[in-house]
């Protein structure tokens, strides 16, 4: 195993030559211990057996040591042949970067270009470094030869902790305030304009009370599901594997044959069906999409609340639309009989027309989204998987991946999101069957 040694001595004429010296590392030096890494721009850190056994890394980077190394190449090579000492280079986030070219310590753009071009090795996990495996067919190659990363993928993943149903902070309240405003204001107006007149009339008092109860129940369901959907953690996880595990089980950052992937942004392996959200800056389990109106991702643990919110909002729009039409008919009938209307009723009639138009536009949009969610859930797919499936429909092997998510029937597929107890499907309760199953160490989100 080879690592590149980069001395961090600025102003040294031999810095480029010393940065390409190779150090042979024995796996026994790792001892399956976690290696804690400080942060710094290309910090050269010397590690010996005692440091590894104590799970510590002592930063012994000083100019005297680097000057001695730069002035005497023979001594430098002798030190590198010592299997009890190694040098690793870290960027600010603790990621080891092979030095393909010499660049300044403050050149973040060039560092990012290396990462984007997959020039980095296995990244760190929770501020711990996973020493990478680099191809080395010839130990005598000169400093201009580039090193490529192995593309072998990991075979197991274990010791993974799932954080279920954690409440996250309400965060930005802008979009959420708008949604609550759009729910409550029409309801209050309809309650006073369309329902209240029925309650003051003896003949229609019972009808008014029934409509009051139904409208209140619908609004409570909308607000409750909206709150749960926006504040429930959609599903996150913490990789607790020892960093030294990835020495023997490197993993690719792109899709492989077994579809195990490494997230270069989160610096850990992504479980199956997990995707990284650029807005939440984390990987979300069984991610469907990120909703700006909720300021949250729709994923494993809150998709039911999202679908219920769309469902009750659609029902409420239809119900309120019916009440407004009935109230409009009453006003028009009153006008035809009395040949006149008070100015107050004329104002209400004008607002009625505007509100009806808003309900029609909102209803079409929300019902279309609800239909899309129902169609995808019935197939056992998420929105992201559906879009990937359309883009890669010519790849049979890729399409076969999603067939295992289909449980064979619509009821079975719905039970994955809503739970096995069908009589609780329309209530904002936690699905009783959300769990993580493990088969031969691989994580499957069901």
Curated annotation (Swiss-Prot):
It catalyses: L-cysteinyl-[protein] + hexadecanoyl-CoA = S-hexadecanoyl-L-cysteinyl-[protein] + CoA. One of its GO terms (molecular function) is protein-cysteine S-palmitoyltransferase activity. It is found in: Membrane. Its EC number is 2.3.1.225. Belongs to the DHHC palmitoyltransferase family. PANTHER family: PALMITOYLTRANSFERASE ZDHHC16. This is Putative ZDHHC-type palmitoyltransferase 2. It comes from Dictyostelium discoideum (Social amoeba).
């Amino acid at each position: 195993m080879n690592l590149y040694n980069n001395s961090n001595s600025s102003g040294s004429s031999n810095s480029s030559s010393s940065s390409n010296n190779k150090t042979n590392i024995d796996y026994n030096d790792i001892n399956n211990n976690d290696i804690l890494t400080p942060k710094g721009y290309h910090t050269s850190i010397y590690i010996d057996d005692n440091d590894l056994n104590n799970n510590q890394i002592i930063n012994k980077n000083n100019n005297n040591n680097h000057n001695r190394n730069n002035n005497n190449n023979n001594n430098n090579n002798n030190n590198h042949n010592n299997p009890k000492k190694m040098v690793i280079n870290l960027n600010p986030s603790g990621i080891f970067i092979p030095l393909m070219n010499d660049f300044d310590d403050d050149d973040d753009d060039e560092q990012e270009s290396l990462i984007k071009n997959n020039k980095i090795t296995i990244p760190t996990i929770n501020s711990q470094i996973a020493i990478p495996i680099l191809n080395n067919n010839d130990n005598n190659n000169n400093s201009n030869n580039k090193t490529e990363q192995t593309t072998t993928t990991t075979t197991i993943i274990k010791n993974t902790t799932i954080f279920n149903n954690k409440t996250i902070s309400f965060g930005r309240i802008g979009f959420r305030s708008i949604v609550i405003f759009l729910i409550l204001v029409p309801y209050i107006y309809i309650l006073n304009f369309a329902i209240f007149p029925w309650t003051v009339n003896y003949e229609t008092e019972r009808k008014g009370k029934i409509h009051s109860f139904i409208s209140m129940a619908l609004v409570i369901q909308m607000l409750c599901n909206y709150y749960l959907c926006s504040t429930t953690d959609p599903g996150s996880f913490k990789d607790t594997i020892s960093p030294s595990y990835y020495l023997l089980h490197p993993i690719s950052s792109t899709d492989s044959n077994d579809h195990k992937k490494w997230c270069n942004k989160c610096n850990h392996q992504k479980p199956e069906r997990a995707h990284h959200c650029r807005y939440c800056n984390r990987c979300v389990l069984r991610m469907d999409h990120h909703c700006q109106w909720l300021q949250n991702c729709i994923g494993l643990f809150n998709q039911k609340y999202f679908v219920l919110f769309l469902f009750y909002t659609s029902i409420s729009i239809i119900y309120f639309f019916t009440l407004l039409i009935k109230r409009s008919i009453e006003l028009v009938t009153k006008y035809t009989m009395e040949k006149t209307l008070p100015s107050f009723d004329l104002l209400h009639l004008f607002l009625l027309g505007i509100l009806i138009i808003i309900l029609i536009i909102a209803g079409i949009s929300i019902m279309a989204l609800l239909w899309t969610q129902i169609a995808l859930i019935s197939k056992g797919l998420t929105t992201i998987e559906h879009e990937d499936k359309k883009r890669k429909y010519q790849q049979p092997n890729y399409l076969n991946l999603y067939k295992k998510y289909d449980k064979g029937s619509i009821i079975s597929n719905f039970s994955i999101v809503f739970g096995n107890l069908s009589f609780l499907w329309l209530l904002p309760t936690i699905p009783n069957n959300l769990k993580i199953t493990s088969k031969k160490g691989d994580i499957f989100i069901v």
